[in-house]
């Protein structure tokens, strides 16, 4: 989606510490509402793969071939921001309390790989792309009291107080979870979505992003690397990227000329990388919408291209084999 450019007033970062996931959920310490401030709480345990520092991981032997297939000069694209043509840019989420009523969800595309629920989805839960969106229509709900995450793909209100969706997954954020092998989630790779989003409260509020960032590519392989659990491709080429693949911004890439916001994102890409989660436009990194984003600052990320990355070691990859 093309991004409308809006210049907002400059601001100073107020850096606050990132807090580990507690033994008990944070509850009222986290705000309620759409795209709410998580007050520095990590969504997943400290030892989650999403929080793993990959800056010292070896480069995969197939890195250059994979990057060439993507296209050396394809730009990084921030697929989040303020709004475009009346719809928020990015994947929104909503934080609810533990007493949010649960409703029925009917699954229409992958019911056998979806968690049946019920799900605590408010009637006014934001939908990716807006109520009339034509894209993936993700719905993400975080229960702050149970520290549980509920996610839907291709979600529509059913007119009876419930929802219908293509697929859905429920995540207990107090521990590390993976979907069963070859199961999808609300994302093609079988991963949770919210933990990989770039959020305003991280970039501006905390001044740091301490997790891998979700991203998409046009062409992928029938393969995945855990914690991913699912592929969404008909191609077997070994120089195509598998789901769950991580690309890392090169350590010597100079960040000094970028805006403070862009530097936060790029430093995360050096430390934690970006994790391939879905088929989509090349090098699109995903975040949550917020009217306070400085679009001119985010647009600077487009100066980075595929050639500035490297694919980290893909040990543990699960690959399908063509039938003979």
Spell out what each predicted region is.
Residues 6-17:
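Bacterial N-terminal signal peptides
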Residues 19-22:
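Sec/Tat signal peptide C-region and signal peptidase I cleavage site
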Residues 1-3:
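N-terminal secretory signal peptides that target proteins for export/translocation
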Residues 24-324:
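Short, surface-exposed polybasic-aromatic patches that bind anionic ligands, especially phosphate groups
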């Amino acid at each position: 989606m093309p991004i409308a450019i809006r210049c907002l007033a400059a601001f100073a970062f107020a850096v606050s510490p990132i807090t580990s996931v507690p033994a008990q959920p944070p509850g009222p310490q986290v705000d309620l509402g759409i795209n709410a401030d998580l007050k520095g709480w990590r969504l997943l345990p400290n030892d989650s793969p999403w929080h793993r520092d990959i800056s010292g991981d070896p480069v995969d032997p197939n890195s250059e071939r994979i990057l060439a297939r993507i296209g050396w000069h394809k730009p990084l694209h921030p697929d989040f921001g303020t709004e475009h043509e009346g719809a928020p840019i990015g994947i929104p989420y909503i934080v609810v309390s533990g007493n949010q009523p649960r409703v029925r969800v009917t699954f229409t595309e992958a019911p056998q790989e979806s968690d049946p629920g019920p799900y605590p989805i408010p009637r006014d839960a934001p939908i990716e792309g807006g109520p009339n969106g034509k894209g993936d229509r993700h719905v993400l709900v975080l229960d702050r009291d149970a520290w549980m995450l509920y996610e839907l793909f291709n979600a529509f209100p059913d007119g009876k107080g419930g929802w219908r969706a293509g697929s859905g997954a429920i995540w207990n954020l107090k521990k590390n979870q993976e979907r069963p092998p070859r199961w999808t989630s609300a994302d093609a790779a079988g991963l949770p979505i919210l933990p990989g989003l770039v959020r305003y409260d991280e970039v501006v509020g905390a001044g740091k992003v301490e997790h891998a960032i979700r991203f998409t590519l046009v062409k992928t392989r029938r393969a995945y690397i855990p914690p991913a659990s699912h592929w969404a491709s008909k191609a077997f080429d070994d120089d195509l990227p598998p789901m769950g693949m991580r690309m890392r911004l090169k350590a010597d890439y100079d960040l000094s000329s970028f805006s403070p916001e862009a530097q936060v994102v790029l430093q995360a890409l050096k430390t934690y990388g970006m994790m391939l989660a879905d088929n989509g436009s090349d090098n699109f990194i995903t975040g949550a919408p917020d009217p306070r984003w400085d679009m001119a600052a985010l647009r600077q990320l487009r100066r980075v291209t595929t050639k500035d990355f490297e694919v980290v070691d893909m040990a543990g990859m699960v690959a399908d084999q063509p039938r003979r």
